[in-house]
Amino acid sequence: MAFRKENKIKNNFSKIRITLASPEEILENSFGEVLKPETINYRTYKPERDGLFCERIFGPVKDFECHCGKYKRIRYRGIVCDRCGVEVTEKKVRRERMGHIHLVVPVAHIWYFRSLPNKIGYLLGLPTKKLDAIIYYERYVVIQPGVAEGLSQLDLLSEEEYLDKLDEIERTHKGNQNLEDTNPDKFIAKIGAEAIYDLLCRVDLDSISYELRDRANTDGSQQRKTEALKRLQVVESFRASKGVNRPEWMVMKVIPVIPPDLRPLVPLDGGRFATSDLNDLYRRVIIRNNRLKRLIEIKAPEVILRNEKRMLQEAVDSLFDNSRKSSAVKSDNNRPLKSLSDSLKGKQGRFRQNLLGKRVDYSARSVIVVGPELKMHECGLPKDMAAELYKPFIIRKLIERGIVKTVKSAKKIVDRKEPVIWDILEYVMKGHPVLLNRAPTLHRLGIQAFQPKLIEGKAIQLHPLSCTAFNADFDGDQMAVHLPLSNEAILEAQLLMLASHNILNPANGAPITVPSQDMVLGLYYITKLRPNIKGHGLIFYGPEEATIAYNEGKVDIHAPIKVYVEDYENGELVRRMVETSVGRLMVNEYVPKKVGYVNEVLGKKALRDIIGSVIKICGVATTAKFLDDIKNLGYYMAFKGGLSFNLADVLIPDEKDQLIQEGYTAVEQIMQDYSMGFITFNERYNQIIDTWTHINGRLSNVLIKQLSSDNDGFNSVFMMMDSGARGSKEQIRQLSGMRGLMAKPQKSGAEGGQIIENPILSNFKEGLSVLEYFISTHGARKGLADTALKTADAGYLTRRLVDVSHDVIITEEDCGTLRGLLTTELKQNEDVVASLYERILGRVSVHDIIHPTTGDIIVRAGEEIREQAAQIIEDSPIEAVEIRSVLTCESKKGVCAKCYGRNLATNRMVQRGEVVGVIAAQSIGEPGTQLTLRTFHVGGIASNVATENSLLSKYDGILEFEELRAVDATDESHQVVVSRMTELRIADPNTGIILANHNIPYGAKLFFRQGDAVKKGDKIIEWDPFNAVIVSEVAGTLSFEGVVENVTFKMESDETTGLKEKIIIESKDKTMAPYARIIDENGEMLKNYSLPMGAHVVKDDGDTVKVGEILVKIPRSVGKAGDITGGLPRVTELFEARNPSNPAIVSEIDGEIGFGKLKRGNREITVTSKLGEEKKYLIPLSKQLLVQENDFVRAGTPLSDGAITPADILAIKGPTAVQEYIVNEVQDVYRLQGVKINDKHFEVIVRQMMRKVEIVDPGDTLFLEQQVVDKFEVMEENDRIWGKKVVIDAGDSQVLKAGQIVTARKLRDENSMLKRKDLKIVKVRDAKSATASQILQGITRAALQTKSFMSAASFQETTKVLNEAAICGKTDYLEGLKENVICGHLIPAGTGLRDYEKLVVMHRDDYEKATAERKSFLSVPTAEPAMEEAPSE
């Protein structure tokens, strides 16, 4: 065997390249050829020579022992045995040594002709079908036509045609087949992968590239153009990887054999073997290859050979990718064998199973129990577990102290658990924290560090306050313990991961270690006041006196008393009298002085705020102590108060019967209206549901009122709810109000369930009847099923989010951008959803912010907006602030600190190296799982709110209308609004400042006019909440056109009343569309209305109508039950940038609406701008139009119903609008569930979705049209080409060619040279830069298109990503987190930042000594000019 250099791979590489393997490379990495299909000898269990497990090729099976046993022991290391040829070395080389198989005929690699896009096919310009025919030996392909007539390259021939051709040529040109292959006259046609190999060798990439580029630019047919561009991409990737890739390497002549220990063969008892599938696949290849060798040697007929060659091709195919073939090779029990590709793919593949998720040593797991007496940073660790985890440290100490001499005896002592080890263990554990982790780890607070305390027993003790972060409870949860070993790891655990440092939630900056349950209840109980009890109204000179009085039993803990206390006012400590209670004094003993005196009832919310302010004012250490103190107080007081409840505490209000009676009466009235035919079936349904929702709401209010006054508010059930310890209004309503309306079971999970109109009137205290119970079960079970299914969805969403954003790291302090986002407060109707304060807090301002009234500068440009400044801005008249945002950050890699703003987990500006991408992904993904787990708590109750149907003024002011068209109703005192885009503003009568903005729905009744003054509480407008309507704007006679029974409408008679109604249906005759017209006495048409599908026509043909009368009602969809079950898919839809199922058609310009004629079931609508530009849209008749003729619309206004697609927003309103749209829409889904997540997390993800642009016109750059590239790459390429010239006519120049791109300088030199020689000079034009349009990618696509191929491959579609990367010869620069984890490097973030790698940590004295030596070295005089003194590190 040839001498081989040790090729250990160093682990300090900084990039990885993937290319096609050439046959030479495979041979270079191989240790020998595998010739036989045998694996091991079944009697001796020794590997067969030259077989798949051969020791000569792959190395010895036992450490330092050759096959025949001549050389044993380590002293013969490196010797090759002269008898059996095995090198004496360690057995682990069998994990890294490769072999190879020499194939008799070349074989095409399945990845390159069976995956889409078809690489070999695109290079040769052959369709997949033809390619398969060649590769699987069905057709000959002409490689060089030579003298043959009527044939060209790449023509396919059947066998007969081929043989005929050969005979013909032999007749006309004798000896043609004996010419050299290089002779252009020779006719060459081949079959199988050999033919493909020859063709690929002959491919001239450059000429194909020029030809295709030309075709893409000039071809008129769109299809041929796309085809050319697709082929061009494959050709260009090969050109880009010139020098490392040759096209013919897609056909293999040598196959590598992976090391035997990676495809083990294990003998089981009973003489059977368990083996890896790969061995079977390799065996088939070797058997077929050997058989083919023999057949060729004995000169078998062509037919037999061809069959054998085809079988070899198939064997190799199934070795590389068995799942891609239609006829996969199956094992004995009909299971497809696992090929090489399958072992990379999926959750069980190499990437996800072994590289990204490894099992680690020094870990333990056990059940958790609560440890109420622990401090915030401590956890209880069972003794036995600790002894095992800290074993090496204990052994070292045992030897150091001289208790034992050898490691072996020390091990025995530890294993026997001798008493001497316990105090050593105590000593070793000091300052050596452990990491606790609870699965599923949904966010970074799922792993925290604690200082362990030894405890008896076998369960881990966990601090009760850190349960929220872990989402742990003590009903049998288990947790894992990990031990950090190196000093750096211990330091990081102590300084960054200690539980007492992780008090804030990175998702929203609110404290996450908030007391819950018992603690809250205890604190709430003692801080609640109770009038008229012992000691009410007493006055004390200080807290001490009050405490003494309490201890003496002179004053009750709840009694309102007056006390002098110290309080902070404007930063000063002052003594003042407050009305408070002994309980509140107790709490304030623990509240840090700087926070001031807390004088309120402490519920969960109040506690969260207090903890937040303690952190801001006093820092983390104080907060940790404060938390422990109130935890102890809370537990103690909950115990002292004896706060449990019995059945009598669950009160049922006396008004219940009366309210239910009211409900019945109202429903009866509705049914009567319905049977008289005043209202439609849907209206009846909606009104009934509404009635019961109202009744239920009123009952709840009565109930809560009664509970809160029961026993002076000290009703246990009420206290539990009010403090936020347990239970919600909903649950109490079900306990003692009524269960309310339930959702109907429905078949598909698509649309929200309808609601059963008979409510459940009983509550749980009274007990449900059998029917009620039966109805209830559906909700409960649906909840449980949803939970199980949705957890997986949420987990998958998190995974995609992490994958798309894991390389977003803070890379620099300031990217220097001048752009930002204009931020205002978010309103829905009238309610502020997110205040300006919340949205700008902790962000960086783009400009100086100046107070409009005083003219002071509040915040300078580039400064963080802190709490105080944000509050000033909130209180001032400033409406909008421009803030720096991740969305506008211009860093090439990652984002910059100024654009990100404050790190929510620390409340300070974010530092370089913070992994904001992963934090964003976790913050968004974690509540997804939480929320889906919460669906069943409300038991499927239909929680829809009673619909509003009128607008009351909230202010005194003057009304202003914009774009209002209204008609006076004939016989009433109001107007009816007939315009669609009407805005109503209420302005302050004195200053004219707008107080409120409202949109007025079409068809609403209007009770005031422009400029009227309104008082607070006046009803301005009123509308029908259940129906959209069409109102007559003129008086006249009604006439219908195109309203034909069973073509455009059907009569529906109501089951109960027998009244008939016309309902417009989708027109069966596409030329006909239903219209309603109003005509005057002379038969002139005054107004024309088109009737949408599903409309109920209220009037009949020939009826006289008055102004403002309703002609048509279009029922709005029925009340749906809400669950985040609707929410999660919505979030996914937004992040994947999917188009909704029925998208709205949107106007692209501002303009006036005109109606055109009908075309094939579509109505044509034109929008004409003021400048006369016209756009036409075709809208299906089945869709409801949202605009009327002559309406004025703005760009981006939907013309038909449906959701607007993000792509439309991007195209019409630009990137900023679509970014804001996605962020706000996703936020809405989470807000609906009451989950707070900071905007910046969504911005990080949306930034990643908008990284890429699509090339519209490549100009003279290297890009292709329709190619998708990174924004920054386009900018760089355009900068590179800027100012350069393109040669049009090379003149007499020897150097330049036409089409070449040159710098102006080179051109000047060349032309001046030509001028001197009086030759023709070079003509040029300016180089054209590329133009590109921004595109929006879904997170899955964005993740698959990251720069790093390793990150993409480990995410999804592994084989596709890898084979495309290999063709391009891609280099992975290991910039993200995943790639580095896969390579086993430290991640380039946090403490692993590449800048810190070169840091040398030394003692100060050593450092000064070293610099002094360096200085003296540098100051030695030399002949050369003195060196500049290097700045000291």
Curated annotation (Swiss-Prot):
GO cellular component, one term: DNA-directed RNA polymerase complex
Keywords: DNA-directed RNA polymerase, Magnesium, Metal-binding, Nucleotidyltransferase, Transcription, Transferase, Zinc
Signal peptide: none
Domain of life: Bacteria
Family: Belongs to the RNA polymerase beta' chain family.
NCBIfam families documented for this protein: rpoC_TIGR
Name used for this protein in its record: DNA-directed RNA polymerase subunit beta'
Organism whose genome encodes this protein: Porphyromonas gingivalis (strain ATCC 33277 / DSM 20709 / CIP 103683 / JCM 12257 / NCTC 11834 / 2561)
Gene: rpoC
